[in-house]
Amino acid sequence: QSIPYAIRNLERLSIASPLPAELPALTDVVRQLVGSSILRQIGNASLALTVRVLSFSYRDGLPEDDSGHGGGWVFDCRFLPNPGREERFATLTGRDPAVAGYLQSEPAVRVFLDRVKALVDDAVDNYRGRNFTDLSVAFGCTGGRHRSVYCAERLGEHLRGRGVAVELRHREIGSGS
């Protein structure tokens, strides 16, 4: 039962502390172990999928992939209407009801989120069927406080409604759940 957990730990360690280049055979073995879906399924432990949802500002660069496998998406919200340009929303975030109401009333935002949800739902179903444990979805905008936060919150809410474990982080406003 501990093998799947050991594989996840090995995966995280191999990312945090890569093996030296002069050990290519060992690097290949670690890569094969980490990539083995069979080893991840051994034992009675049921491995659950966790979707990591993140909001961020493009000003500070793309977020790091903590899972190490790179599975998921980065969505650019800068094309959506920007509440940050309106004085009344300047000090608020996408978590505040006034900003959420503004963005929810915009057809482009609703269409965008519907499409993102459909895409992520397909991936969640696929990942669950293959016993994958990590999927990342990041939303970026100019300041990382309004549009990206709102979109991350809505996706997290949607996924939790489907019974999916969600880790939600807002890099620029320093909070999440």
Question: What are these model-derived regions, one by one?
Answer:
Residues 133-156:
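Catalytic cysteine-centered active loop of the rhodanese-like fold, especially the PTP/DSP P-loop
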Residues 1-137, 174-177:
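C-terminal accessory "lid"/substrate-recognition subdomains
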Residues 114-121, 149-153, 157:
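A generic structural signal for well-ordered alpha-helical surface patches
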